[in-house]
């Protein structure tokens, strides 16, 4: 009887999966953490070639799983995974902060190039306030900012932080971001949940001096929130003024506030919250348009007693204020309890978020977990949820101009040359499939293949499994993922 019941549940889940519309636009990302060598490089001091080989292997795995973006930590602790005039080389590359890779190369330029080759977006992940990861054992270079400006920093627990209350700190962070978006072809600037640090029981964050100087007329909590507001506004202005195409996203802790603290809060019992403990008023940032997307870290399982995934998913849908909402999934928790031993946990989370029109995708923490194919989730993504490619959803407030449609030249029965001659820059061509007799567009045609190209591409029909009673179409796709009109291919 139990076997029959289990089979019925499995069939029901399978039916539910295939009954859903497969999205042509869906963010599918993975966090790649470099701090403490969590994901990449696997250890410090590896030769440059080995570092590159490891990153290529990571990208290939995620591309196979259907991902279209990676979120890579490029500034773990006031250091850099790239040559910088402002901050030293990261110790997580070579084992010693300030020491360049050997043989020399630019890891960030390399990672961006390899990511874009695969038609994926590269989101540069920065930590705004962490300066020294561990004051007892971290390598700190002589030219590190903590030694140039020791008056900017505060020790809390075993870490050293920028003091968020200092205007000079905000200016320094803006300089770092401006340099990054000026020199590199990144697609977004991304920051996670670490604004003010998570509270340590019995210890107050030691910012009394800066509060006394700058906090006039505000409570300390209000002042701290205003400091986070100020850095977000300043960074958004910096990005817009430097390269308006680049997106700005935040990945906050999953609970903004509990309902017991605020009528707008969620039906949760979070021990710490964004608003009250990290001083990050995410809702204000969304309302004001200071950020382009939000990725709440909903790392709990469905049915969690204190922070239910289902409850929080609906809550964030209600409060995304027209900006893009992607959901952060805690796949690193695979196998940690019964809920995370259940192979349906992540598939069900994806199915549920797809039932909300305002949720536009997923980001998974962390990259290395996928190398183990936990609970067969790689197989589920490849064969079901992400079987077909998807484009990162475009952001019309940044750019809503579609590129010109491509032209087609037939070479043989199975080969076509696709050309683009428009003024708008493009990054790829999309091949779509649609039923005969249907006026094809991106809402009713299925994206089946992406060809990374800026001018010309060859379409080989023999490599595509075309169905009967369907026609193929091609379209141009620009840097903001706007799609041209579809042109009949075959």
Can you name each region flagged by the protein language model?
Residues 414-425:
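Conserved aromatic anchor
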Residues 462-483:
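Beta-strand-rich modules
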Residues 22-29, 67-78, 107-154, 190-193, ...:
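Glycine-rich, aromatic-flanked loop segments that form ligand/cofactor-binding clefts
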Residues 67, 118, 147-290, 299:
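Polysaccharide-binding and catalytic clefts of secreted carbohydrate-active enzymes
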Residues 53-79, 183-187, 284:
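Catalytic domains of carbohydrate-active enzymes, especially glycoside hydrolases
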Residues 25, 33, 37-53, 124, ...:
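Active-site-adjacent "subsite" loops/lids of carbohydrate-active enzymes
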Residues 65-102, 201:
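Aromatic-lined carbohydrate-binding/catalytic grooves of carbohydrate-active enzymes
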Residues 279-305, 321-397:
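Substrate-binding cleft of secreted/luminal carbohydrate-active enzymes
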């Amino acid at each position: 009887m139990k076997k029959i019941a289990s089979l019925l549940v499995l069939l029901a889940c399978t039916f539910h999966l295939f009954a859903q519309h497969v999205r042509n636009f869906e963010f599918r990302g993975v966090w790649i953490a470099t701090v403490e060598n969590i994901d990449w490089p696997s250890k410090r001091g590896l030769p440059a070639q080995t570092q590159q080989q490891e990153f290529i292997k990571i990208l290939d795995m995620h591309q196979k799983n259907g991902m279209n973006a990676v979120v890579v930590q490029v500034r773990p602790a006031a250091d850099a995974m790239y040559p910088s005039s402002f901050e030293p080389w990261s110790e997580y590359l070579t084992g010693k902060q300030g020491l360049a890779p050997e043989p020399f190369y630019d890891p960030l330029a390399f990672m961006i190039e390899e990511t874009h080759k695969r038609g994926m977006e590269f989101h540069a992940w920065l930590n705004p306030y962490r300066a020294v990861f561990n004051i007892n054992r971290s390598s700190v270079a002589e030219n590190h900012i903590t030694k140039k400006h020791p008056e900017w920093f505060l020790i809390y627990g075993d870490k050293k932080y920028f003091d968020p209350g200092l205007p000079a700190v905000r200016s320094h962070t803006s300089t770092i971001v401006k340099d990054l978006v000026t020199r590199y072809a990144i697609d977004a600037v991304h920051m996670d949940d670490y604004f003010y640090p998570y509270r340590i029981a019995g210890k107050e964050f030691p910012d009394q001096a800066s509060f006394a100087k700058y906090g006039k007329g505000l409570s300390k909590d209000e002042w701290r929130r205003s400091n986070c507001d100020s850095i977000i506004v300043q960074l958004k202005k910096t990005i817009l003024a430097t390269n308006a195409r680049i997106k700005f996203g935040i990945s906050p802790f999953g609970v903004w506030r509990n309902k017991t603290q605020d009528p707008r809060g969620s039906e949760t019992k979070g021990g710490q919250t964004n608003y009250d403990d990290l001083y990050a008023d995410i809702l204000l940032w969304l309302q004001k348009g200071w950020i382009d997307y939000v990725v709440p870290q909903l790392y709990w399982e469905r049915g969690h007693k204190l922070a239910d995934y289902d409850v929080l998913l609906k809550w964030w849908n209600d409060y995304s204020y027209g900006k893009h909402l992607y959901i952060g999934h805690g796949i690193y928790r695979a196998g940690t309890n019964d809920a995370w031993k259940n192979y349906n946990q992540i598939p069900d989370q994806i199915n549920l978020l797809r039932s909300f029109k305002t949720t536009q995708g997923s980001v998974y923490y962390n990259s290395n977990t996928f190398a183990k194919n936990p609970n067969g989730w790689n197989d589920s993504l490849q064969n079901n949820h992400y079987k077909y490619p998807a484009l990162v959803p475009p952001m019309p407030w940044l750019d809503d101009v579609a590129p010109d449609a491509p032209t087609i030249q037939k070479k043989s029965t199975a080969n076509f040359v696709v050309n683009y001659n428009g003024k708008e820059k493009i990054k790829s061509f999309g091949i779509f499939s649609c039923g005969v007799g249907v006026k094809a567009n991106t809402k009713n045609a299925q994206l089946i293949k992406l060809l990374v190209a800026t001018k010309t591409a060859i379409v080989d029909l023999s490599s595509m499994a075309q169905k009967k009673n369907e026609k193929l179409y091609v379209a141009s796709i620009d840097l903001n993922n706007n799609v041209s009109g579809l042109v009949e291919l075959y």
